[in-house]
Amino acid sequence: MTNGCANGKGTIYYKNGSILYDGDFINGKYEGNGRENYENGTHYIGQFLGGYRHGKGVMYYNNGSILYEGDFVNDSIEGNGKLIQKNGNYYIGQFLNGLAHGKGVMYYKNGSVLYEGDLVNDKFQDNGKEIYENGNYYIGQFLNGYKHGKGTLYNKDGKILDKGNFANDHYSKCLIF
């Protein structure tokens, strides 16, 4: 303790006696490496700065499996990382404010690609390639998570099914402006 503030290694406990935080402190704040446990059973192991998750870290589901591994900025998932959904599908790419944002690749739980391209606020956006579980795929433009704009829908063998304009996830025979 320095001036009444924790410095060095230490542990903070919940009222019930379970550990809230175990790790490094500087001037009473989480700083350096540590583990923070949350009341819902999830926990974080990684770097802290000024009391916030900041730097490299790993978030875990309450069953102990990995939820997210990558960069944090001021307590938010931001930068590059890997997010694993409860259904086993996962995303590797860029994040902003806790959401998939920028370039990235989404995978089915079996490791095959579900989507590759641009994302904005967790939604497919601009240009990308979406591959369906039956092997068919779409290459083209997206808007708010939907096929929208110019694009081509292929079957699993590469034969064109629809080519042209798409609107709100459907092939459109009408011209889109």
Regions found by a protein language model. Name each.
Residues 172-176:
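Terminal, low-structured helical/coil segments at or just beyond the last alpha-helical repeat
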Residues 1-7, 20-32, 43-54, 67-78, ...:
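Conserved anchor residues at repeat-unit boundaries in beta-strand-based tandem repeats, strongest
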